[in-house]
């Protein structure tokens, strides 16, 4: 099968590389996730040899845990990257879906740093059990406004507020609100 063995329009030597699998069909997605992780691992290894720090950002990480093999590869990378001069940041709006995977649960529980924003009731219940979050702390991620949440660093969990005024250039650059095309 040589579906992925063709020239690409992505310059993998750029400082920032985006691998967008949004339109990948369901049949090819498990393989595409593994291929993407392999490409990311190769880049981390190359940068390590050159003494460069790498920051890997995975959005919608729950997709990796829908498939056993990509979830396992991601878990190994999660454990290894820090040793190789890389940080791995994962984001998902679908926490409950992630936590169906035992591998994802291990990653959440063993992560030194977590930012939690507004969560649905079922997500809060799962996170509370897994991370030992009190009811008082959970109130900070219940119907929370944008920029409000909980920060877990090591064994400490603290509420935070990090709002950006709407009339600033930073807000225009950072907003993720659908329909706000401010830039």
Features from the language model and the residues they span:
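P-loop NTPase motor domains
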Residues: 1-86, 99-102, 140-144, 149-155
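P-loop NTPase motor core of the ASCE superfamily
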Residues: 96-183
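H-loop/switch region of ABC-family ATPase nucleotide-binding domains
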Residues: 92
């Amino acid at each position: 099968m040589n579906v992925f063995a063709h020239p690409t329009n992505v310059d993998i030597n750029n400082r920032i590389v985006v691998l967008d699998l949004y339109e990948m069909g369901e049949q090819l997605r498990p393989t595409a996730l593994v291929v993407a992780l392999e490409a990311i691992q190769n880049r981390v290894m190359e940068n390590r040899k050159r003494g460069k720090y790498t920051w890997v950002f995975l959005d919608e990480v729950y997709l990796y845990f829908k498939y056993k093999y990509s979830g396992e590869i991601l878990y190994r990378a999660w454990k290894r990257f820090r040793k190789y001069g890389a940080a791995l940041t994962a984001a998902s709006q679908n926490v409950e879906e992630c936590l169906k995977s035992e591998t994802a649960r291990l990653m959440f529980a063993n992560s030194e740093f977590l930012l939690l924003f507004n969560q649905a009731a079922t997500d809060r219940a799962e996170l509370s059990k897994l991370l030992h979050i009190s009811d008082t702390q959970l109130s900070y991620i219940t119907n929370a406004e944008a920029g409000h949440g909980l920060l877990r660093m090591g064994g400490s969990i603290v509420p935070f507020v990090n709002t950006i005024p709407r009339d600033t250039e930073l807000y225009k650059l950072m907003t993720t609100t659908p329909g706000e095309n401010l830039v």
